[in-house]
Amino acid sequence: MKALVIAATVCACGGKPAPRVSTTTLVVHVTDQAKAVAARVMLVDATGAPVHIGTLDVYKTRQGGGACAIAPGVIGSWDGLVLGYGVAEVPVGVDACTPSPAIPYGHYKVVAWRGIEYDRWEGEVDLSADRGRVELAIPLHHAWTPHGTMAADLHVHAFASDDSKMPNQQRVIAQASMGIAVIGLSDHNTAGDLTAEIHELHLDDVVTSISSDELTSDTLHLGVYPVRRGSGPPASKIWHANVDQVFQIAHSFPGNPIVQVNHPRFRVTALYDQAGWDGVSWPPPFPLAFDAVEVLAGYTAFNIPSDRRFDDSVRDYYTLVDHGHLVTPMGNSDTHDFTWVLDGSARNYVYVDDARTNPFDEAAFIAAIRARRVVATTGPWLDVEIAPKRGATPTAGPGQLVTADAGGVWVDLRVERAGFVKLDRIRITIGGEHGPELAQTIDVPPDVPSFGWHGRIEVGHADTWIGVTTDGDTPLPLEQTGWYQREKWKHPGVTPFAIASPILVDADGDGRWKRGDADIAVPKR
């Protein structure tokens, strides 16, 4: 890479401006088993402060369009470098960013990460002046691998949202750096996708995009996907539409898209809160015309003693399932910028037969969401398999059905986590005689990367379901999740939580699952 040159001083040759030249270049190589991977790299100076790059341009509190394209495929953001390819040559001391220099000459601590599947890497680098090319190798360690899934963030904002303004290419790089494979671009009342930007960045083999639209009204937000780019009514017909009208608009899109309720416990523009639902009474005071709901939503991604927002969201969701309203539990970031809520801070792992992004089997991916084949998480991996009895095959996973054996089933669980994710418990909930009931709480030993549990769970002889969650009370690192919880609400931060889509149990063995409004044939496997 050629040295960056910027006119600054005056030389002795005729009084012409002399160029300022960066005399040190940071050459980064982030790898997973020697293969370059997109990632984030934060530099921390001698005072312990992170190097902030760019400006806070959205309401003077958030960074949307104020980041700096500091090098090809590299975004200089408020919390560090965002590397789209894992390999980069970044100028130090002199650059075209505002303010400049983005990275002053000096000695830095380095922290690198790639979403939640990898352990953090920490080291040091000397970027003093006149050091030339400074090589920095960052080998990341995969803490866990979600086999047979695609990581998806299906509620994401970019340039077309007036409260984001992040350039679309930067959104692609940001998502790729956090290990997301499927992006649902869901700008407010705008149907769009990121396919063109992904192709321009040559990231087709890494990430793909689904065209989505977040229908945004005063009372609720609905995600609709996949939709045709540029389709949908004008925003003026949606802003002040009532709940019934917004659902009607959602179902007017051709092709029977997924209708997803976004952040229903956000307190504002939140369906459950606006309707005054307590999460238990039935029927709820709103239409049930949706396929999926954000149980883990980026702006409400926490449990604290005074506000167990995750637990409330799971309670709401289990009430729906218990009455036979089988919708998919989703986890999406709702990211708007580079500061408040970050890409993939809540995400989905969708079980698919073909996990490639190029080509991408969109129809199969959407079918998997509709079939509830999802684990949603803000940090840990949660594997759930259920069989009629110990050793029986095949087993049932998230969203599937199993037949009980003499009023019980055999449950195999495993939680895995990166080192920065602290877990405390696993909870198993079943549909009881009078509604959802906690069947078992299992303590997770501290500081173990992988923990398994198995045992028989009694379910009785009426058709039911089994839901499993895992969570912890220690917040995740703010630089990895964003600063919204602390800056806006003075909360410690995002806490780790995962939910597997419940497994249905044919307890009476009649070949059908009947509970509430549902009557479903148990497929032969």
Which sequence ranges carry the predicted segments?
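Sec-dependent signal peptide recognition
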Residues: M1-A7
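C-terminal motif of bacterial Sec signal peptides marking the signal peptidase cleavage site
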Residues: V10-A12
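Bacterial signal peptide processing site
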Residues: G14-K16
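C-terminal functional module detector
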Residues: R20-V21, H29-T98, P104-P139, A143-W144, ...
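Active-site gating loops and adjacent loop-to-helix segments of metal-dependent hydrolytic enzymes
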Residues: G54-V74, G223, V227-A235, Y272-N303, ...
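A metal-dependent hydrolase metal-coordination microenvironment
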Residues: R120, S128, H141-G279, P305, ...
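Residues embedded in well-ordered beta-strands within globular domains across many folds
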Residues: G184, E294-A297, L504
